[in-house]
Amino acid sequence: MSRYTGPKWRISRRLGVSLSGTGKELSRRAYAPGDHGAGRRAKISEYGMQLREKQKLRFTYGLTERQFKALFNKAGKIRKGTHGTNFMISLEQRLDSVVYRLGLATTRQQARQLVNHGHILVDGKRVDIPSYSVQPGQVVSVREKSKNILPIQAAIESVVARPQFVSLDTEKLEGSLVRLPEREELDADINEALIVEYYNHLG
């Protein structure tokens, strides 16, 4: 299944989550798209709730279903902690997610593009794979020739606060995943237990 490239605002309103991270999609019309979006929503089934929760998280991180499920299955092999929480943490360890959390990009999509285009280094070596799993202590930096490109500079200037599990030297544009995030530091609007139930239901 290919990555969704359609209108993000429409998907945001349908799922009730801001895919851009700005919240603008929901500020005007917080209901689902369509002629009857503002009306009373039909009650959805338990399976429907599980599917919607899975789609919310998948679209938030911009992954294909294949990428999403592969990481979900990998997280299930981690012995410590719960499957759902480990999955959420694994999503945050993706290089594009770390670049986004460091404030080197304003959206995860932009962070993915920076990685794809070779602007990002890990421990001094170029890594152009967005799904690369960053480990605590690894140094994530911007390539010297890329430090002055406008999107990165604009992103740095727009940062209000960074999560405590990452750290960035704004002069060197060099940072790291200080530690793995705690569940309470991640998206509170996601019920990962429903996602686990969804995949368990599929078998």
Swiss-Prot record:
Q: What does this protein do?
A: One of the primary rRNA binding proteins, it binds directly to 16S rRNA where it nucleates assembly of the body of the 30S subunit.
- Pfam families, sorted: Ribosomal_S4, S4
Q: Which GO terms describe its molecular function?
A: rRNA binding; structural constituent of ribosome
Which NCBIfam families does the record cross-reference, listed alphabetically?
PRK05327.1, rpsD_bact
Q: Which residues form the S4 RNA-binding domain?
A: 93-153
Print the keywords alphabetically. Ribonucleoprotein, Ribosomal protein, RNA-binding, rRNA-binding
Query: According to the UniProt entry, where is the signal peptide?
Result: none
Similarity annotation: Belongs to the universal ribosomal protein uS4 family.
Source organism per entry reads: Leuconostoc mesenteroides subsp. mesenteroides (strain ATCC 8293 / DSM 20343 / BCRC 11652 / CCM 1803 / JCM 6124 / NCDO 523 / NBRC 100496 / NCIMB 8023 / NCTC 12954 / NRRL B-1118 / 37Y)
What is the protein name given in its UniProt record? Small ribosomal subunit protein uS4
Concerning HAMAP family, the annotation shows: Ribosomal_uS4_B (MF_01306_B)
InterPro entries (UniProt xref): Ribosomal_uS4, Ribosomal_uS4_bac-type, Ribosomal_uS4_CS, Ribosomal_uS4_N, S4_RNA-bd, S4_RNA-bd_sf
Which is a Gene Ontology cellular component entry for this protein?
small ribosomal subunit
Q: Write down the PROSITE patterns for this protein, in alphabetical order.
A: RIBOSOMAL_S4 (PS00632), S4 (PS50889)
Subunit and partners: Part of the 30S ribosomal subunit. Contacts protein S5. The interaction surface between S4 and S5 is involved in control of translational fidelity.
